[in-house]
Amino acid sequence: VKWLVALSIAGCGFSPMSASSDGGSASPPLDAAPRFHKQITLAVNSPTELRDFPVSIVTRDADLAAKAQADASDIAFTTTDGTPLAYELVAFDKSTGTLEAWVRIPRVTASVELELVYGGASIASAGTVWAPAIYAAAWHFAEASGPWMDSAGGHQVTPASPETTAVAAPGIAGSARSFDGFDDAAPGDPADSGLEFGTSSFSVQAWVNVAQSADPFDMVIDKGGDTGVPGYCFTLGTGSWYAEVGDDNYVATPFGTELALLGHWTQLTAVIDRTTNNLLAYTNGAFSTGVPFGTIGSVDGAPPLAIGSTQSEYRFKGIVDEVRVVKVALSADWIAAEWRNATMRSQFVTFGAAQTE
């Protein structure tokens, strides 16, 4: 069980809570004590079926403020027939009813309905939101300070000192981190090999909001991927923004040009697809560019993954949120659904009226 520490940001105080990571095992039936519930409709509108899809739920709800427990231990999500779903409660502010959560949807194409339940006895998640076969890492940056632990695989990135710690900022979902472009960086453990994929397919994703780049090459994700350094990275900066991957050599494909991507939240996704032997870049839920791997082999290498490069010439300046490392080649439909979920919340997630059981 992972405990998130309290966070105060933008005038909201967030209470600590836990998230299960038991791999999706079933939990006992929900407690029979009286509780409240609201129906949630998810308008996913995917052309193909998505399985074990994590949906972001961010809401400010007066009923939660009035009826939910302060530690959020009574808040849960179920199917419409009461079957518990896997969820992660990232943050809850009892005073305003502000909730940030993720819910794992077993399968969905067009739409699905579920229930938000609260106000009764404490209950547990029915497993982990982040399907172990899919997700290697998922960072939310909800902690008040570094280190920052991911919710999927327990990978940790740690700023070297308080002076090099990116400050909290409002994110695309809850809290994010704002890097100063000077010395802020959060490297992982050099002994952690859990984010290396050899010659297998994988994907990497980050949400960024950049007002002004620091340098020609600002690395928001840095795990090698350059000449003579196997791995992968996202290189932003004053020119085009790139996804890069390589062994001793590397290939790169652009997300787009800096001018078009400044001043707003941008979803960047790189898909390393070994089946088609291509590196694919997606920007804001849509395919951008792609390039063949050629002779690129294993991308395993010594540098640990860093969020915000530790290399002085590649410092990242901007806000980053919801960093993902994924064990599979994500589909275009999956990436597009993630983008709609984060940017079209009022259409993607709708709440019904409160009811009493």
Give the location of each predicted region.
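Ser/Thr-rich, Pro/Gly/Ala-heavy low-complexity intrinsically disordered linkers and tails
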Residues: 1-31
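GGW-centered surface loops in extracellular recognition modules
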Residues: 29-81, 93-154, 347-348
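Extracytoplasmic low-complexity segments
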Residues: 123-182, 290, 336-357
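Extracellular glycan-recognition modules
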Residues: 145-149, 182-242, 251, 276-278, ...
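Flexible glycan-contacting loops in extracellular carbohydrate-active proteins
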Residues: 171, 237, 290-319
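Short, aromatic/His-centered strand-loop micro-motif at the edge of beta-sheets
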Residues: 188-190, 242-267
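Localized edge beta-strand/strand-to-loop motifs within extracellular or lumenal beta-rich domains
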Residues: 264-280
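Ligand-recognition surfaces built from glycine- and aromatic
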Residues: 308-346, 352
